[in-house]
UniProtKB/Swiss-Prot annotation:
One GO process term, biological-process aspect: amino acid biosynthetic process
Pfam families: SKI
Keyword presence, Transferase: yes
Protein name: Shikimate kinase
Major enzyme class: transferase
The reaction(s) this protein catalyses: shikimate + ATP = 3-phosphoshikimate + ADP + H(+)
Gene that produces this protein: aroK
Length: 172
């Protein structure tokens, strides 16, 4: 095992739990959204407004490929990473994949508290609670099909990281 990938909806805690997990393993952490923003020189919201979703999705796939070249790394991915079949295959083949799963109501309440919510472009143009419910309904099957393990992301990030550590230990 050289890489661990965290997938799930916005506000599921991928980045925070990923940092904790990486620290406990003595590994690096990477975030594909941060990688895209660094390369683009702007926020994802600005990139999508300027260039559109297809350009962002292509940049996101490039960030995943770059992450797949790293070793001893926990990679937090953007919520839409699973939308492309080639990304799903790269995730499953590239390492252990954890789906951080939480109900839409929990995710919506976290989004309200998120200080970087303005950097997240709307996916549907709807209000955040309705948007997260619709997007989660659309993507849940893809997350589950891609993941090797599903973890309960309703808990604090440290507990989520603990769940992942236990699953890794049990898998040997």
């Amino acid at each position: 095992m050289e890489r661990i990938f965290l997938i799930g909806a916005r506000a599921s805690g991928k980045t925070t739990a990923g940092r904790i997990l990486a620290e406990k393993l003595g590994w690096r952490c990477a975030d594909t959204d941060e990688m895209v923003q660094r390369r683009a020189g702007c926020s994802i919201a600005d990139m999508v407004a300027r260039d559109g979703w297809p350009v962002f999705r292509e940049a996101e796939a490039g960030a995943l490929q770059a992450a797949c070249a790293l070793t001893r790394v926990v990679v937090s991915t953007g919520g839409g990473m699973v939308l492309r079949a080639d990304n799903r295959a790269a995730l499953r083949e590239g390492g252990i994949v954890f789906y951080l799963c939480a109900p839409a109501a929990v995710l919506a309440s976290r989004l309200v508290l998120d200080p970087v919510v303005s950097q997240r472009p709307s996916l549907t143009g709807g209000n955040p609670a309705a948007e997260i419910a619709a997007v989660l309904a659309e993507r849940d099957t893809l997350y589950r099909e891609t993941a090797h393990h599903v973890v309960d992301a309703c808990q604090p990030a440290a507990a989520v990281a603990g769940q992942m550590l236990r699953l890794l230990a049990a898998a040997g």
